[in-house]
A protein has these predicted regions:
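Helix-to-loop junction immediately C-terminal to a conserved catalytic motif
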Residues: 55
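Conserved ABC ATPase "signature" region
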Residues: 71, 108, 119-137
Length: 150
């Protein structure tokens, strides 16, 4: 059985006026469906670069990256867009919330922008809010939430 995401000796480099700098080198990583992963490290250690490569927002220079056993080296923009929409979710250090919207409205906005019909959203939004333990904050504006709740 193949992993949801698998990196084999993946590297990312940046070329600049002062030469080549390394984003990260020879990373081996396997992620399975439903697995929760936290990438940690010092500032400048390549965490964001790695996540951008995994999500297809940036390319890699060496190695192999597989999505459910499929080699991504031939992926086109449309393939990465489909992959991100279906399988990838990032949580950013700086919150990307509309402060004047409620918890419910923020989730609804993301779902509508990703192409879902409003009629499909209500039940799923309620499930997601329950899943993360924010049921009592459903109608609370994002600006009133603590950092942890955001």
């Amino acid at each position: 059985m193949s992993h949801a995401i698998e990196l084999k000796k993946v590297s990312k480099y940046y070329a600049g006026e002062s030469g080549v700098s390394m984003g990260f080198a020879r990373v081996d990583l396997s992620l399975d469906m439903g697995e929760f992963v936290a990438i940690t490290g010092e500032s400048g250690s390549g965490k964001s670069t790695l996540l951008n490569v995994i999500s297809g927002l940036d390319n890699y220079d060496e190695g192999e990256l597989f999505v459910f056993g499929e080699d991504t080296s031939g992926f086109q923009t449309e393939d990465y867009e489909r992959y991100r929409k279906t399988y990838i979710g990032n949580i950013f250090q700086d919150f990307n919330l509309v402060n004047s919207y409620t918890v419910y409205q923020n989730i609804e906005l993301v779902m509508l922008l990703s192409g879902r019909k409003a009629s499909e959203c209500k039940e799923r939004i309620t499930e997601l809010i329950e899943l993360v333990g924010l049921t009592e904050y459903t109608k609370t504006k994002a600006s009133k939430l603590s950092g942890g709740k955001k």
